[in-house]
Amino acid sequence: MRGLRRADVEVTLIDRQNFYLFQPLAYQVATGSLSAEEVAVPLRQIVRRQQHTRVILGEVTGFDLASRHVVVDHLPDGTRGVEIPYDALIVAGGSRYSYFGHDEWAAHAPELKSLAGALDLRDRILLAFEAAETETDEAKRDAWLTFVVVGAGPTGVEMAGQIAELGHTLRREYRSVDTSKARVLLIEATEHVLGAFPDPLPRKAETQLVSLGVTPMLSTTVIDIDAESVEVQTADGSRTRIPARTAVWAAGVTASPLARLLAQAAGTETDRAGRIVVEPDLTVAGHTEVFALGDMVSVRGQQLHGVAPVAMQQGRHAARSIQRGTREAFRYHDKGELATIGHKRAVGVVSGVKLSGFIAWALWLGIHITYLIGFQNRLIVFTRWTFSYFTRGRGARVIHS
């Protein structure tokens, strides 16, 4: 949208939600560091100065590439089957977490790809501490104080670290239970956390996690999840059922259903993760007016991670292509990657330089403040983080459920 704000075009933005979620900070909503309104901005507020842009609240359920229109259902008044014409189309449906064929686990281990998931997790985490406070049976209390995070990519690592820190923050607010002794188990199927990061950063991240009280369980896979436990299997085949009342899912992703719909409409292929395969210029094969972006796509000849910087650069590339009428190959400029673990703890690579500790943490904070949409949100988040730095407090701990 920003790339087209000065272009001589009419823009129609269609989304089933009326807000944009800054996903990299969703886990801070889940752990009470930030409120929902600080990481989610109304779409109409974002484009309020772009008079050539209109917003439609609805869900895209079909594409007719021959006649160049999309089909929209679930409008606010219940209308279905509305056809929206286009000259150029950009599809950026994102992705969702994959439960590897066990969608029933989602009821017991919510994900962090959505604002609803983050708010659900916040309620579950805070309610777990409340339940532990009144539980007299020691085994049941331990289960309430055991938190399992599945997946040790950046989101899983950040979530595990934040839950551990939350336990330390709350210890003076409870009388019958020591929240700082909460167990946080980080389950990862591979041999290291942050497997996409270069050595020695995964090992440094593991050390920092352990210092916070997180227990990494590596080379371990999840076999089953229910409301009261998580069953895991280690590399030697042995199985263990862990009593735990709170689980978080951050393992594996699959493309948005829009990828499959678009691929079917174009007669093109998808990969194993359900992502539509697009040309190097980000257009759909045979349709130079249709662009697909972000982690719902696989670009021919390129291996790109499903992270926000990739999608942002792809968005700018598509906007330039539409304005100039050109179709040049997309080239990703990798500026690095950072993962925060906790207070003054982080690891990352920036411009080829490997960083860890306070410097990496400060860079992470600065970069994420910069990418937030809206001056007001940047100011509020900066103020909250500054307050938290000096007091270790968390001001967004209201239970809604």
Regions found by a protein language model. Name each.
Residues 1-62, 147, 154-197, 248:
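Beta1-alpha1 glycine-rich phosphate/pyrophosphate-binding loop at the start
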Residues 15-16, 93, 152, 189, ...:
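Cofactor-binding loop segments of dinucleotide-utilizing enzymes, especially the Rossmann-like FAD-
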Residues 53-148, 237, 248:
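FAD-binding core/adjacent interface of flavoenzyme oxidoreductases
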Residues 55-72, 76-77, 164-280, 286:
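A Rossmann-like FAD-binding core segment of flavoenzymes
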Residues 94-97, 160, 253-255:
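Short glycine-rich anion-binding loops that position phosphate/pyrophosphate groups of nucleotides
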Residues 108-136, 229, 241-313, 320:
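FAD-site-proximal beta/loop scaffold in flavoenzymes
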Residues 141-197, 201-207, 215-217, 307-321, ...:
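Rossmann-like dinucleotide-binding core of oxidoreductases
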Residues 310, 314, 319-401:
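C-terminal, flexible cofactor-proximal segment of oxidoreductases
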